[in-house]
Amino acid sequence: MIVLTEQERRLLSLVQPVAEGLGMEIVRLRVQGGRRPHLQIMAERAGGAPTGIEDCARLSRGMSPVLEAADPISEAYTLEVSTPGIDRPLTRPGDFARWIGHAVRIELARPIDGRRRFTGTITGEDNDGAHIELDDETKLVAAVHEMSRASLVLTDELIEAARVAGNLPPQPEDDEDMLADFEIDESEDEEDPETGDVQ
């Protein structure tokens, strides 16, 4: 998988068996800091089958007791489970092979000739890594574990491919709302001192 922190690797080891038991796959796991940490998990049904909010809710319910028991994040945090969306992240070996011919953005964990960020078209994937034809017509080959970020670029061709695969809602106007989020606040309810409302 793409480069993870030690904490993210620990979290992945906890939630991945839950996802597999439900016939799902973890696409990306990320912990974002701030006043309240945010644990973001993107997942899809095995094999890239169309995934909906019910799948996310089921996965979230399955993961919550596991995370609560292990307590991998010591402070209050928010858990978000969502589908990858159209301009999905590419994080695992094999992800690039599914999207040959589509535009991609990549950020490497370590720079090549002083450069870390690249944009181009996926031309293949093999044991050496993903093959990308860059916008300047040069070529890049990089393994997934050498990347810190990678995602598809939203184009008309990508939207059509997602529609054909059944990964778009029936209403065209909903293209930008493709993520099916299911959020759980892992902290106790708090009262707003100004309004008295429970948050």
From Swiss-Prot:
It is found in: Cytoplasm. InterPro entries: Ribosome_maturation_RimP, RimP_C, RimP_C_sf, RimP_N, RimP_N_sf. Gene3D superfamilies: Ribosome maturation factor RimP, C-terminal domain, RimP-like superfamily, N-terminal. One of its GO terms (cellular component) is cytosol. Keywords: Cytoplasm, Ribosome biogenesis. GO terms for biological process: ribosomal small subunit assembly; translation. It comes from the Bacteria. It holds the Pfam family RimP_N. The keyword Cytoplasm applies. Residues 172-199 have a biased composition (Acidic residues). Residues 165-199 are annotated as: Disordered. NCBIfam families: PRK00092.2-5. Belongs to the RimP family. Required for maturation of 30S ribosomal subunits. This is Ribosome maturation factor RimP. It comes from Hyphomonas neptunium (strain ATCC 15444). The gene is rimP.
